[in-house]
């Protein structure tokens, strides 16, 4: 590594450590920011000599990255951005902090995938899903798929592990059609993780025709784009690998969606040569992920934290939550996106019949949505008020990003 890069890496580690010591955060952003100011090519230098996996998508990135890092860890030390800092500053900080490791598994914000592909030259890229998220400032889903596709076409040597159930992901992972409009066979390993949210993939990104669905299958009514046959699938409480062998998966994380994330992790690890029978044992070591799914006992209540930041992830959170009193917390600060109209894309009907409490900066926006959805609720001013308002036992907490962080801080829980 050049001298400038060595100095930048050292300063990055020092800045991150000082940030942690001063209680100003985990240092996962500031360290990388300073390092890249000293050497703009620092991420590329730190990536050299490592076998790297990138994990990107709208939802499930952090959990899948943690599961994948655990699975790849069978082979040796793995650098990873476990705090969820998923932009180049976070990647730089994570690699600088880890030092020399043979492997790295990095969560990548979907908007930065092309840039990080160029800098890191990964061995494999995992594409999870694409759906609407922070539309007041983020790109439309179809535009995001176009960016992914353009980036991947420039890196034909990179292995791709992609979700066969998401038409946008399949199109992005598939090479452009040839001159006679047939879609070229993709050089991709496909997994099936399901797709609960369909509202962003009814129109074919290739020709503009309608996407048709029947059971697990989907296809375009106007061109050859259709669901590919997945090599990795979820079956009951396990995962079926490309040989047809079934592996029981014992996770400490709730919800069927995390079984799909586990299938993705096993597929990515297999690209590094990890046998599923070895990798599956490591998946059960993952508990909470950057506070997600954490359970905290407070005043006789067992409080479980679930993060939901867009319509698709709210539906998944409802699936994970027990039939118990539930607190919903909504903010609209810069990291959340300022537009809360997406609340009307979420069907809150699954919450009927349980005690529902609401709080957060934009609790009244949420109140209007629940009123329209005929879901009774109680407004509380603080998280502490919510805890006192429910009987002893389980309290499910579903919150968007900054609301989630506020509640974590109140619980003094920093992972």
Per-region residue spans from a language model:
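ATP-dependent carboxylate-amine ligase
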Residues: 1-32, 48, 208, 220-227, ...
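Phosphate-binding loop of NTP-binding sites
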Residues: 3-190, 202
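Adenine nucleotide phosphate-binding catalytic loops in nucleotide-utilizing enzymes
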Residues: 4, 186, 190-311
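A generic structural signal for short, well-ordered alpha-helical segments in conserved domains
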Residues: 65-69, 266, 367, 408
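Short, acidic/turn-prone active-site loops that include or flank metal/cofactor-
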Residues: 83-86, 129-133, 193-196, 331-334, ...
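Residue-level signal for inorganic ion chemistry
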Residues: 107, 128, 161, 261, ...
């Amino acid at each position: 590594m050049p001298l400038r890069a060595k100095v930048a890496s050292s300063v990055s580690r020092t800045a991150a450590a000082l940030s942690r010591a001063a209680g100003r955060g985990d240092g996962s952003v500031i360290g990388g920011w300073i390092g890249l100011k000293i050497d703009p090519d620092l991420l590329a230098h730190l990536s050299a000599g490592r076998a790297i996996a990138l994990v990107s998508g709208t939802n499930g990135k952090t959990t899948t990255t943690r599961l994948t890092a655990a699975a790849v860890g069978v082979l040796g030390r793995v650098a990873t951005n476990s705090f969820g800092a998923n932009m180049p500053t976070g990647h730089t900080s994570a690699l600088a902090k880890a030092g020399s490791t043979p492997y790295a598994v990095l969560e990548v914000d979907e908007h930065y995938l092309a840039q990080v592909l160029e800098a890191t030259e990964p061995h494999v890229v995992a594409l999870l899903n694409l759906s609407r998220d922070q539309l007041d400032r983020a790109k439309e889903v179809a535009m995001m798929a176009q960016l992914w596709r353009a980036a991947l076409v420039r890196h034909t040597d990179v292995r791709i592990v992609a979700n066969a159930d998401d038409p946008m992901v399949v199109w992005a992972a598939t090479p452009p059609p040839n001159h006679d409009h047939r879609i070229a066979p993709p050089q991709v390993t496909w997994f099936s993780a399901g797709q609960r949210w369909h509202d962003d993939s009814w129109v074919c990104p290739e020709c503009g025709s309608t996407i048709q669905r029947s059971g697990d299958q989907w296809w375009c009514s106007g061109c050859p784009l259709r669901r590919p046959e997945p090599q990795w699938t979820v079956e009951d409480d396990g995962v079926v690998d490309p040989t047809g062998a079934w592996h029981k998966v014992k996770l400490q994380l709730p919800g069927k969606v995390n079984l799909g994330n586990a299938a993705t992790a096993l597929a990515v690890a297999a690209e590094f040569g990890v046998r599923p029978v070895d990798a599956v044992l490591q998946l059960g070591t993952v508990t909470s992920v950057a506070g997600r799914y954490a359970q905290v006992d407070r005043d006789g209540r067992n409080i479980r934290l679930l993060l939901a930041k867009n319509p698709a992830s709210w539906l998944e959170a409802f699936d994970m939550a027990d039939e118990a009193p539930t607190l919903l917390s909504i903010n609209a600060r810069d990291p959340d996106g300022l537009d809360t109209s997406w609340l009307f894309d979420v069907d809150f009907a699954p919450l009927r019949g349980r005690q529902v409490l609401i709080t957060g900066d934009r609790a009244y926006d949420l109140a209007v949505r629940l009123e329209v959805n005929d879901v009774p609720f109680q407004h509380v001013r603080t998280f502490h008020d919510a805890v006192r308002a429910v009987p002893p036992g389980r309290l499910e907490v579903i919150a968007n990003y900054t609301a989630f962080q506020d509640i974590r801080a109140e619980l003094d829980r920093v992972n």
